[in-house]
Amino acid sequence: MFALVLTALVAPSAEGSGLAGIKAILNGVRGLKDVLSMKTMIVKYLSLPAVLTAGLYIGKMGPSIHIVTCAAKNLLKFRLFESIRKTKTLKQEMIVCGIAVGCAANDGAVVGGVLFGAELVGTYYSLRNYFKSFYAAFIACMTSRLLHSAVNLNIKPFLTWNVKIVPPSFTLPELFFMLFVAIVMSFVGIAVVFVNEQLLVLRDKYGKLHLGPFKFAKYATNKLVILTENRIIFTIIITLVTSFLSFPQMIGKYMSIGGVPIFEELLMAKPLTTVNGAKGEWIQGNISEVFITISIFITVRYILAILTTVLPVSGGSYLQLLIIGASFGRLVGEGLAFILPDGFSPNHPIVPASYGLVAAAALTSSQTQAFSSVFILLELTGHGVHLPALGASYIGVVISRWLSYSAYDFVIKFRKWPAVLESTTDSDDIRVKYVMQYVDSLPILEEKASLRKIGEFLEKPDLAKTIPIVNNKSDLLLVGCVNTKKLQDYYNTMKPTLEGNPDYDTEIEIEKNTCPITISEDTPLVLAHLLFSKLNLDDVFVVWRGRLIGQVQKSSIIAELTDRNAGFGDA
């Protein structure tokens, strides 16, 4: 309840994992100041432990990354980092380093964290940031592990999850079954994204209504009235249902086990019995009971995890997807081991845990569309390389990108943040000439103009931030550009001269800047996307042999791509 009230009243942007907002910012969206604000960081830092201790089926990797990224962004306010704050590219690199640090500090995954940060950026990543990210992630990982060792009074500086799958954990015939598991989990990941999207639509439509038929309009000015909204009541109900299902005398015998321990248990190399060290009562008598218990576990966990993901509290989904994937893979592995007790070849029995690892990799990769998620998983479990898991992750990403979009992209689309995502610019068939504004409708200035003409020009409504300067309106040779605000300031300075002498009509040469970036009308939109993403531009002039023929704006690209995607979806 503490986390719910704190998030709802103080920082609503602290809900969820926060990774979608980070991706939107890294893809050029402006105006999302609350996503990486100090207020959001503090609220998330205080509410995340409360949500985790409440027993809700959520993870902490995404929120941890969000907290560290907020810290990295707010560090730029100090004078020490002033040079970084003034450079757009370095500011972006600082945020990407924050992603790597958050992942490394939370999971001890240095390589996976850096790669995840690179994938979260979008299509284009500055390779010069690799060393910085690896260095920051290594320091974060070492510090986190050493502090963990100090708290637990042990001498092990590195902590990985207790997963022991002794190689070789599979034979060649088993690769076909692992392929089947990967394909199934890929579609499950797509289903997770789709269901989450529909639940968010419902929450947005009905979540802010108040307790059914009761009217609270007269209390609308009171902030506390937000606690009577349906989304708040729904959160309390989900918490109570989760607590009820975790009761030890019912299915809580295996549902109540924490996130990491249950994942370790599902990847046990031995059968899931208490004799072998299992904490959950998966098997009480006959070995075949494991099929019933795991089936119940998957069903309940899947439903509650999806419902919990859309609650207005801090929390991620990565750990829960690992658990759901591992449980399905374990179920398939146990089935094969039951049918083929000796395996496909002598002295090579089937290891159900290996199927769990493959399924977990496929499900997380399908939901995030990030191949780096498998490296995070392998670092967590202490496995440097597991070929079936790598293959499963690749299958998950390919199928998901073919049929759907990632969990982060759907939030960006749902919130209608103006981000140009890489999934919408894969085709070279879309050219700049289809989305640009032609010169006939552009406000332009000649390089030599009178104050009176400049004043009349500035009276035009909806002027762009940058005005093109041409040699004359017949040749339209682009000679530079001028900032609208600077032009307005210059005119205001010279305006008294014009008012004191109405006949003053001397032409002056406008102080202009060069246009370092221009493109042609046949430039593919994917290349224009590169310019807007990496250089953080709002608009670019389109020229042909030095002649101004138009201007393309970031908003026009977003509108065109949105319309094309909508048309494709309707078809």
Residue ranges and their predicted role:
Residues M1-K473, L478-V479, N483-L498, Y504-N513, ...:
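Alpha-helical transmembrane segments and immediately membrane-proximal extracytoplasmic
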Residues K554:
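Short alpha-helical Gxxx[C/S/T] motif in the catalytic ATP-binding
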